[in-house]
């Protein structure tokens, strides 16, 4: 029994000792935790002060950097303004130099043109002739109202629509016929002859005026005065011719009246003196009026012929161009005409 009791007593003693040790440990932990808290509360304001001081230093550095950057920007802006003014002055000087060169070139061109005009005064006429030739070539070709092939070929260079060349033999070429020509809307010689003639007359008149002006410009002032006086002299000559013509006609009438009186009896003359006198006066007045009208018309014709040499040339040019157009529209041979006038293509 003694051994069991001793064992129980030892057990409870050991248990009490263990609880006591545990309690002491817990108390010691609480004490350490409270001390740490107190220490932490004491160190916080120091850290805040340190951080604020550090931030203030950083702000001061940044302000210095900003001021430096502003100063650098101002310097760069001043440099840029100076460079801009310098380049603008250079550009203005170069522009003035270019304008001077242009003026010099214009003056030189004007002097060269004057020199060329003095040497060759007929350059304008040559240019107008070239322009008139270009206009003639650009005009549409005229064809007669007949199914003849290759009529609208300028200078025999373009090919036919069917792929036939104008230089190929007649057996290989195909005629298009009258219906195709009419449906294609081409002008016939009866449609466009008046327009072409008017254009040619106007062009010839311009060319003639240019030639006369160039001839007059090349003449001396004495010749110009003589030319200006020439129409007056012509008018005087024409008036003299008219007067001579009227006087001759009056003399002829007097001669014829005397011859008629020789054939008439005296009794009839005595009875019809009043009638003959009246009729003679009326006839004389009519004849004089007709003669004056004829003289005026002749004067007008003479003045037109003397003052306008362009119309003769225009009429001759008309006839020549009409003959050329008719010759151009005719076929080259009888074989072409027989090949072109196929009965199947008319139907």
Swiss-Prot record:
- State its location(s): Nucleus, Nucleolus; Chromosome, Centromere
Report whether rRNA processing shows up as a keyword of the record.
no
Q: Name one GO biological process term.
A: spindle attachment to meiosis I kinetochore
Where are the Phosphoserine modifications? 168, 230
Task: Give the free-text PTM comment from the record.
Answer: Phosphorylated by CDC5. This phosphorylation is required for the location to the kinetochores during late pachytene.
Biased composition regions of type Polar residues, renumbered to the chain: 131-140, 155-172
Q: Where mainly found?
A: nucleus
Cellular component GO terms held in the UniProt record: monopolin complex; nucleolus; nucleus
Query: Region (Disordered): which ranges?
Result: 112-183, 208-230
Coiled-coil stretches noted in the UniProt entry, renumbered to this chain: 46-118
What Pfam families does this protein's entry cite? LRS4
Keywords on this record?
Cell cycle, Centromere, Chromosome, Coiled coil, Meiosis, Nucleus, Phosphoprotein
Q: Where is the composition biased (Basic and acidic residues)?
A: 112-130
Q: How does it assemble?
A: Component of the monopolin complex composed of at least CSM1, LRS4 and MAM1. The complex associates with the kinetochore.
What is the role of the protein in this entry? Component of the monopolin complex which promotes monoorientation during meiosis I, required for chromosome segregation during meiosis. Involved in rDNA silencing.
Q: What else is known?
A: Present with 1390 molecules/cell in log phase SD medium.
Q: What is this protein called?
A: Monopolin complex subunit LRS4
Origin species: Saccharomyces cerevisiae (strain ATCC 204508 / S288c) (Baker's yeast)
């Amino acid at each position: 029994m003694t051994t069991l009791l001793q064992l129980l007593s030892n057990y409870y003693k050991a248990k009490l000792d263990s609880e006591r040790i545990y309690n002491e440990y817990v108390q010691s932990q609480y004490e350490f935790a409270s001390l740490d808290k107190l220490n932490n509360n004491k160190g916080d304001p120091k850290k805040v002060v340190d951080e604020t001081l550090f931030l203030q230093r950083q702000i001061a550095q940044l302000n210095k950097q900003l001021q430096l950057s502003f100063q650098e920007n101002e310097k760069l802006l001043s440099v840029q303004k100076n460079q801009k003014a310098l380049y603008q002055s250079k550009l203005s000087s170069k522009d003035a130099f270019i304008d001077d060169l242009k003026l010099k070139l214009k003056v030189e061109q004007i002097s060269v043109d004057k020199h060329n005009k003095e040497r060759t005064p007929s350059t304008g006429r040559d240019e107008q002739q070239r322009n008139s030739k270009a206009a003639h070539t650009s005009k549409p070709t005229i064809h007669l109202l007949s199914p003849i092939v290759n009529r609208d070929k300028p200078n025999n260079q373009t090919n036919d629509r069917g792929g036939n060349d104008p230089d190929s033999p007649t057996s290989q070429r195909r005629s298009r016929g009258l219906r195709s020509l009419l449906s294609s809307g081409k002008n016939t010689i009866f449609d466009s002859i008046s327009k072409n003639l008017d254009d040619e007359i106007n062009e010839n008149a311009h060319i003639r005026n240019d030639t006369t002006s160039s001839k007059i410009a090349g003449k001396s002032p004495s010749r110009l005065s003589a030319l200006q006086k020439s129409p007056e002299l012509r008018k005087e000559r024409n008036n003299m011719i008219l007067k001579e013509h009227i006087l001759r006609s009056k003399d002829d009438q007097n001669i014829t009246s005397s011859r008629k009186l020789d054939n008439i009896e005296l009794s009839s003359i005595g009875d019809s003196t009043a009638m003959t006198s009246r009729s003679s006066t009326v006839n004389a007045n009519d004849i004089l009026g007709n003669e004056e009208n004829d003289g005026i018309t002749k004067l007008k014709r003479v003045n037109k012929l003397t003052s306008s040499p362009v119309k003769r040339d225009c009429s001759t040019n008309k006839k020549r161009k009409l003959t050329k157009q008719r010759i151009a529209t005719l076929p080259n041979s009888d074989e072409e005409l027989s090949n072109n006038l196929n009965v199947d293509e008319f139907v």
